[in-house]
Amino acid sequence: MAKKDYYQILGIPKSAEEREIKKAYKKLAMKYHPDRNQGDKTAEGKFKEIKEAYEILINEEKRSAYDQYGHAAFENGQSNSTYSTFTNSADFSDIFGDVFGDIFGGNRTQRAKKGADLCYNMEITLEEAVKGIKKEIQIPTLQKCKTCYGSGTRTGTKPRSCSTCHGKGQIHIRKGFFTVQQSCPTCHGKGTIITDPCNLCHGQGRVETYKILSVKIPPGLDTNDRIRLNNEGEAGANGAQSGDLYVQITVKKHPIFEREGNNLYCEVPINFTMAALGGEIEVPTLDGRVKLKIPYETQSGKLFRIRGRGVKSVQNRNQGDLLCRVVVETPVNLNEQQKNLLHELGNSFHGFRGEKNSPRSKRFFDGVKRFFDDLTR
């Protein structure tokens, strides 16, 4: 049975360039791949045709021979092996890897593997978070070996190219009608072999050590904010780029202030005479004390805003506010004279339902009375 023309199989003209061949192959291989057509013998046969056509046309020498002699150019020299290892078919593996990813072509060389990122948890006080601070930290890490400068070899020597993968770090294995790409078992994907390792790092190119860094904390950071320090993570393998260091911020609980966004909150206790008659008190801020006027007849829970005494925004440098919540404190440990004065004051209110002096109390008890009246109807 006559074989079908390779150009027709891929649906391309005989003048097609390399990029057109790859594009056509990617489209057809994705459509007819056995993993997408399980149990479909027709699709399996079609995929074999597509693969065979691609391997011939993507190779300049084979394509030239095919253009001159057709299928006869390969009838005597074609391999019947169903399992063969080869290392010089990069074009096919690259295109196959583009289509099917890590399953068939995802194990790339490990020669330039970036170092791992590190995370450091830093606790700071609220004052430090608001004003900013510079702190020194010590972190365990892997650093580039100072003896071999990351090469892993003894001074004056170099790694030799792996003879199995010819320095590529990967090999390709043909199994039946498809090809599998995997890391080279000899060099473990590095592409090179160290025969004379460095005495300090023993061929690893990196050594375990502690690194001391000075970290600048800008004003305005809050819990769960992170600072990224580029290239301060672990050194990369084989002299590759270092990873990054992330400093995770946790702000300690403050005994007076609570933070919400860029605003600070605090509770300020006042006695009931101050609440009733008004006056002036001093309240704390992170920059010192400030005076706060309490108007007469102030109720417990009222919020007073002191502008510009909060936290500066780390984004736009706008300053938040300090909000003071007044808590009216009931007096305790009263002496007889004080108790008598309070009794006298209470009598002057004409009872606790006084409409004029305690409007909230009157509204409450009027509501209670209506509630019970409704129950007894």
Swiss-Prot record:
GO terms for cellular component: cytoplasm. SUPFAM superfamilies: Chaperone J-domain, DnaJ/Hsp40 cysteine-rich domain, HSP40/DnaJ peptide-binding domain. Gene3D superfamilies: DnaJ domain, Heat shock protein DnaJ, cysteine-rich domain, Urease metallochaperone UreE, N-terminal domain. InterPro entries: DnaJ (IPR012724), DnaJ_C (IPR002939), DnaJ_domain (IPR001623), DnaJ_domain_CS (IPR018253), HSP40/DnaJ_pept-bd (IPR008971), HSP_DnaJ_Cys-rich_dom (IPR001305), HSP_DnaJ_Cys-rich_dom_sf (IPR036410), J_dom_sf (IPR036869). It holds the Pfam family DnaJ_C. Zn(2+) 2 binds at residues 162, 165, 184, 187. One of its GO terms (molecular function) is ATP binding. One of its GO terms (biological process) is protein refolding. Binds 2 Zn(2+) ions per monomer. Zn(2+) 1 binds at residues 145, 148, 198, 201. Keywords: Chaperone, Cytoplasm, DNA replication, Metal-binding, Repeat, Stress response, Zinc, Zinc-finger. CXXCXGXG motif repeats lie at residues 145-152, 162-169, 184-191, 198-205. It is found in: Cytoplasm. Participates actively in the response to hyperosmotic and heat shock by preventing the aggregation of stress-denatured proteins and by disaggregating proteins, also in an autonomous, DnaK-independent fashion. Unfolded proteins bind initially to DnaJ; upon interaction with the DnaJ-bound protein, DnaK hydrolyzes its bound ATP, resulting in the formation of a stable complex. GrpE releases ADP from DnaK; ATP binding to DnaK triggers the release of the substrate protein, thus completing the reaction cycle. The J domain is necessary and sufficient to stimulate DnaK ATPase activity. Zinc center 1 plays an important role in the autonomous, DnaK-independent chaperone activity of DnaJ. Zinc center 2 is essential for interaction with DnaK and for DnaJ activity. This is Chaperone protein DnaJ.
